[in-house]
Amino acid sequence: MPETNRLSEPTEWIDLEFVERQRTPEFAIQVGIQLYLAGLSLSNTKQYLERLGVKRSRTAIHDWVRKADLQPDCDVSPNQIAVDETVIRVNGQRHWLYAAVDAETNQFLHVRLFQTRTTQLTVLFLRELREKQQLSDTTFLIDDAAHLKAALDRLGLRFRVSRHGNRNSVERVFREVKRRTSSFSNTFSNARLPTVDSWLKAFAVWSNRCQS
């Protein structure tokens, strides 16, 4: 089980302040979150914890990830940020995943899931990113989508249309996200937008850990 190889890594990136009772040992919560985000299914994560003497349901493990409220962040101001969106399906329905990725490091800076794609929602996504990042010296790398250009223009942010080179960083991370979300309908019962959005943010944090 190669995913377990990362269990020796520091876990300071997992804030356990959400743990209200000591019914579950903190180490078990950390292990469960790590394994699930690393690629194990909820069922396999549950089985691994049982071998450690901790019996918890799949729902409990999923709730740990949700309650941890992991959010991607970055201390540096990237020179170039690749921004794009892609369709993922949850319970058979189309949703739009927006992502901003440091074009040099492939690290997620911000992710957000929407039920549709509009210029106004793109503006909202970029405003949320601007609250987290200093963007005055940043150039955004985008495709030729009209809503992306309109939103960046509206916010006075510098951008360049680019279909190759560093903009491909966002395509690479999208491939992994799609691989993981393809099983959502089999993993979550009646998955809702906030549920999937919180998982995506947690996955972004995990992905950034793998890049560092």
Each language-model region and where it sits:
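Short conserved beta-strand segments at catalytic cores or DNA/RNA-binding microdomains
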Residues: 36, 91-118
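Basic, short loop/linker segments at the boundary and entry of helix-turn-helix/winged-helix-like folds
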Residues: 1-37, 62-63, 76, 82
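Charged alpha-helix within mobile-element recombinases
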Residues: 174-212
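Acidic/histidine-rich, metal-coordinating catalytic segments
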Residues: 136-148
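Active-site beta-loop-alpha junctions of metal-dependent nucleic acid enzymes
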Residues: 111-135
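Two-metal-ion RNase H-like nuclease active-site motif
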Residues: 77-90, 99-101
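Major-groove recognition helix of helix-turn-helix-like DNA-binding domains
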Residues: 54-69
